[in-house]
Regions:
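Export/targeting segments at the very N-terminus of extracytoplasmic proteins
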Residues: 284-331, 365-368, 382-386
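Hydrophobic residues within well-ordered alpha-helices
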Residues: 77, 107-108, 158, 204-209, ...
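Acidic, polar ligand-binding/catalytic clefts
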Residues: 57, 75, 86-157, 223-225, ...
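Extracytoplasmic small-molecule ligand-binding "clamshell" domains
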Residues: 23-123, 127, 194-199, 219, ...
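Bilobed "Venus flytrap"/periplasmic-binding protein-like clamshell domains
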Residues: 49-58, 63-84, 120, 139-199, ...
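Substrate-binding/active-site groove segments that recognize
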Residues: 335-359, 366-377, 423-424, 448
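Extended ligand-binding regions for polar small-molecule ligands
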Residues: 23-42, 68-80, 146-172, 220-222, ...
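Catalytic and substrate-binding regions of cell-wall glycan-acting enzymes that process beta-1,4-linked
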Residues: 250-251, 392-458
Length: 473
């Protein structure tokens, strides 16, 4: 919503795809591998480079409040190291967020000193990486669905069904093995939808609750944590997915002193009893997505499709981006009104509409026209750089639509200063937004993105083929 103050599905049998921490965020990409550093070199540099899983569940911080499960443990380790410093020089943590499946490779290349994934993560022998003592032992995987739908008691019952998984999911090997067994019995495999890289495990769980995805698999601690936020989720605990695993931190094999220090720290560390207080308080207030393709909403979208396609085409946009924004703003209600001034399907303000030459936003056509034109204006004026891919470009446009383009540009500047990727909103610039303005804008962009992905999965059925023109003879 513009405020007055600021105007794949991939179904296949499983084939594996190849102080405050957030203020210390580091680079997304490192072009030259750094040398291996053990504890002496780390103390000399006064910086411990920590590669973290970029998901908000693992490493998020909101306006100085920890929501990531690794935050407290890493801060305690920082204090432990400084408490044992002989020269009195303090070590600072430099947080480097990466996708889960990139963490160990980055460590092996010397881009960080320590990996703290916050989830189960398998180490490959080729990486030459050592594990710490277990942070958590015997961690099972749970099958997650939504209450009211069919329960499962064994993995083979998933034959022919689809699981939504993030790349790097700990369930990958287990599904591969069960598919081999199903093939021997000539049964359909369990299909895997590798979700879009803009989604983290917490996003997938929210979309399962909404009914956009039907099933996923996550570690027990993640399931238990998010069950307090997403109460409609159902956990089929009796399904034996794989042998329980252990959670670790990871270091290079030749960083033996660092590993020894980590193990000594872990022997005495206890998770704070209030670790999730801020997490629950923040997330319980946030908007949660629902299925935008439920029967009634799908019927509304079908009626709105011509006008959305018309104005998206005029502005060179994907009409499903307009549809996703319209659903988030007004739930496809052209008569929606807001006391602050936003009006209609796109919830655009009169002042924003006037900036793009639309003086009356009461009709459906003019309302969508104003919204599409305003999005195009933001895109053209602030986010036209060829360095942005189209998904990230749209995310920046949405963030600017919500809180103003100048503010978003300022966040990109701050991200660049801290070594984050200023051309990536998801998991990079959004970290600056979380710190500066809280979760509101991040939740807004993520929600519209989820609706877009939900529509995009059904694009073929939402876009009837053009009528054939009879040839003249």
């Amino acid at each position: 919503m513009i405020r007055p103050s600021a105007l794949l599905m991939l179904c296949l049998t499983l084939l594996l795809p190849a102080a405050a921490l957030a203020r210390l965020d580091g680079p997304l990409e490192v072009t030259r591998p750094g040398k291996v550093r053990d504890l002496a070199e780390i103390r000399s540099s006064r910086t411990l480079r920590v590669l973290v899983n970029q998901s908000r569940n693992s490493s998020g911080e909101v306006q100085g409040q920890a929501i990531g499960v690794e935050y407290h443990r890493l801060r305690a380790f920082e204090q432990y190291l400084n408490g044992h410093a002989r020269d009195g020089q303090e070590i600072n943590l430099k947080i480097i967020p990466k996708a889960k499946d990139q963490l160990l490779g980055a460590l092996a290349r010397g881009e960080g000193d320590l990996v703290a994934p916050g989830e189960l993560l398998d180490v490959k022998a080729a990486h030459k990486i050592s594990t710490s003592d277990p942070i958590a032992s015997g961690v099972p995987l749970w099958l997650v669905g939504v209450k009211g739908e069919r329960r499962f008691t064994k993995l083979e019952q998933l034959s022919g069904r689809t699981l939504a998984l993030t790349t790097g999911s700990a369930a990958a090997d287990a599904i591969s093995q069960v598919n081999q067994k199903l093939a021997l019995h000539k049964q359909p495999p369990v299909k895997v939808e590798w979700v879009d890289p803009t989604l983290a495990v917490e996003d997938v769980l929210e979309m399962v609750q909404a009914g956009i995805f039907h099933l996923t698999i996550v570690e027990k601690p993640i399931a238990e944590r998010w069950s307090k936020i997403l109460p409609k989720l159902r956990f089929d605990k009796q399904v034996a997915i794989s042998e329980p695993g252990d959670e670790y931190w990871f270091v290079r094999q030749d960083a033996s002193m660092l590993r020894a220090s980590i193990d000594r720290f872990l022997k005495t560390y206890r998770t704070p009893s209030d670790q999730d207080v801020a997490f629950q308080r923040i997330y319980r207030r946030l908007y949660q997505v629902r299925n935008p393709l439920a029967r009634v909403d799908r019927q509304r979208l079908e009626k709105l499709r011509p006008v959305l396609q018309k104005h998206a085409r005029e502005q060179g946009m994907d009409w499903l981006n307009l549809a996703a924004l319209a659903f988030k703003e007004s739930a496809f209600d052209p008569g929606a009104r807001n006391s602050g001034g936003p009006t209609g399907l796109m919830q655009i303000t009169p002042s924003a509409a006037q900036r793009v030459g639309v003086n009356n936003i009461e009709s459906l056509d003019s309302n969508v026209q104003a919204g599409a034109r305003y999005l195009a204006l933001i895109r053209r004026k602030f986010f036209a750089s060829p360095k942005l891919n189209e998904r990230e470009r749209m995310a920046f446009v949405l963030a600017a639509y919500n809180m103003g383009p100048e503010r978003v540009q300022g966040m990109r500047t701050e991200a660049r200063r801290r070594g984050l990727n200023p051309n990536q909103w998801f998991f990079q610039v959004e970290r600056i937004a979380m710190e500066q303005v809280g979760m509101g804008a991040v939740s807004y962009v993520n929600s519209v993105n989820k609706y877009y992905l939900a529509f995009d999965r059904e694009r073929e059925s939402l876009e009837p083929p053009a009528p054939k023109i009879a040839s003249r003879k």
